[in-house]
Amino acid sequence: MDMGHWYVYLPLRRLGHEVYFYDTVEPEEKDYKKIIEEFKPDLIYCCLTGNKSIAPHEPWKEILDETNSGRTKTFNWFCDDTWRFDNFSSKACSYFSVCSTPEPAYIEKFKSIGYDKILLGSWHANSEIYSPKSFSERDIDIGFVGTPTLSRRDYLVDNPIPVEIIFNVSTEEIFAAHSRTKIGLNLSVNDNDPEGGTQMKQRIFEIIAGGGTLLTQYHKGIENFFEIDKEIVTFETMEEFNKKAKFLSKNERITKSIAKNGYQRLLDEHDSKIRLSKLLKQIEEI
């Protein structure tokens, strides 16, 4: 099931909204214009990628027509601005009434090209679909949920620190794995970025929603969302990762305290319902 179902559709329904979920991979009704005319939405909430290989039914023309008509607000949630701003986001944003970026530093980049209707759209996680276990019940000491790509081998395979890798599993098993993990590892480098840069990852919020301690590769701007060394732990080098992973593994009291603080911050500010409610209000005000 698409993460949009768990992190957008279900929370919006919980907030009391009537929502039509259009699957851009294999939609039940392929005539998007027909859907608009029948459903008559107040807002068209999108996460369009421009990648036909993964989402062959993205309705770009229909979205642009609706934006230009002025009768319905259209919105796009951009995900990968650190490496797709120049060749995608900077061009696609004009199709929508308003857009968001997960990168604080990219707000000004959008404005510099004349697109002012840009919002900071923080990643978030739906706490209602996780079942955090007590630390004594957690059977994964250090875990990484994701594909062990070549760039991640140094941390996941060629390293004396044992990391349990969870991949090629169902979405429900991903939620369960985060809820069973004491220390959740996030690697922020994006393999699709030719320059090997880091970016904000949804995994950051998923680890914390599962109740574990987040140990994450540092990415500029993460301190806008969590307090470093109180709610999360960051590293920039392999040596720093090894040192902090060993420390957290040997000091469970501190590890549990950081996990508790991070989880409370997520519930207060980064739970899907809270983030989406705030985002909808910002969209309405534009």
Mark where each language-model region is.
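Nucleotide-sugar donor-binding catalytic core of glycosyltransferases
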Residues: 1-39, 46-63, 85-90, 94-228, ...
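Active-site proximal beta-strand in glycosyltransferases
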Residues: 65-81
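Short conserved AdoMet
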Residues: 69, 227, 267
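A broad detector of short, well-ordered amphipathic alpha-helices
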Residues: 179, 205, 243, 253, ...
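Conserved acidic donor-binding segment of nucleotide-sugar-dependent glycosyltransferases
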Residues: 232-238, 247-252
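Catalytic phosphate/metal-binding cores of nucleic-acid and nucleotide-processing enzymes, i.e., regions
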Residues: 238-246, 262, 272
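A charged, aromatic-enriched C-terminal amphipathic alpha-helix characteristic of glycosyltransferases
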Residues: 250-281
